[in-house]
């Protein structure tokens, strides 16, 4: 649909640009804003419409869903971004990492995570979440089934990468372990390989 989604974390919002060849121009305005009621508002919030320090984004072209790493609220928001339904200050369809849209406390069970980078595999409908906060146990990548019939709010990870198990905490550098993993929209290549940058 020739749209560009931009995470504007400092202003607690996502900007949506129409990048059709005949419309793109230097200094162009965004067409839609998510997370705020207007283009001049910037307050963080906790609801189905608001977010706090959004970071990485992942796009599902088949289902026309946008996954937003809402790092300040320890969750991932899922928006329906079909052109006929997307609008400014849209309500998220679903949430991952929290039981509802009004909860933001860090969770220590399998359904919680510390949000970081996101990558989406469109062939398998898997969402990869890089957890890269200061808590050692969250220096890992968790893998979720986000297919259309999956229960996202109650989702538990299918697997963990970068650690030998869900209860492994040591920041050891080895073939199976990593520190400060980073993911982005280009992290899955045409051969279905997941490319992970690590640091620290």
Regions found by a protein language model. Give the residues of each.
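Surface-exposed loop and turn segments in beta-propeller and other repeat-based domains
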Residues: 27-49, 88-110, 153-178
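Short loop/turn segments immediately following beta-strands, especially the blade-tip
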Residues: 18-27, 79-89, 144-154
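Residue position within the beta-strands of beta-propeller blades
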Residues: 6, 68, 129-130, 196-197
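Short loop/turn segments immediately following the C-termini of beta-strands
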Residues: 9-10, 19, 71-72, 81, ...
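Short loop/turn segments that connect beta-strands within the blades of beta-propeller domains
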Residues: 10, 62, 72, 123, ...
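Beta-rich catalytic cores
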Residues: 10, 29, 53, 72, ...
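A short loop-to-beta-strand structural motif that recurs across blades of beta-propeller domains
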Residues: 12-16, 29, 74-78, 91-94, ...
């Amino acid at each position: 649909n020739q749209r560009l989604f931009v995470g504007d974390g400092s202003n607690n919002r996502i900007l949506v640009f129409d990048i059709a060849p005949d419309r793109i121009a230097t200094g162009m305005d965004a067409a839609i804003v998510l997370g705020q009621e207007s283009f001049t508002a910037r307050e963080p919030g906790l609801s189905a419409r608001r977010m706090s320090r959004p970071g990485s984004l992942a796009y599902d072209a088949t289902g026309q869903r946008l996954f937003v790493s809402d790092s300040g609220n320890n969750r991932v928001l899922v928006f329906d971004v079909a052109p006929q339904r997307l609008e400014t200050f849209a309500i998220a369809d679903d949430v991952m990492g929290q039981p509802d849209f009004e909860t933001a406390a860090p969770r220590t069970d399998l359904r919680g995570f510390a949000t970081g980078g996101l990558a989406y595999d469109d062939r398998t409908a898997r969402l990869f979440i890089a957890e890269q906060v200061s808590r050692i146990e969250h220096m890992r990548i968790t893998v979720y089934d986000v297919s259309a019939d999956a229960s996202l709010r109650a989702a538990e990870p299918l697997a963990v990468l970068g650690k030998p198990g869900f209860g492994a905490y040591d920041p050891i550098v080895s073939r199976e372990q990593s520190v400060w993993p980073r993911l982005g929209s280009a992290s899955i290549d045409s051969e279905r390989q997941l490319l992970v940058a690590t640091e620290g």
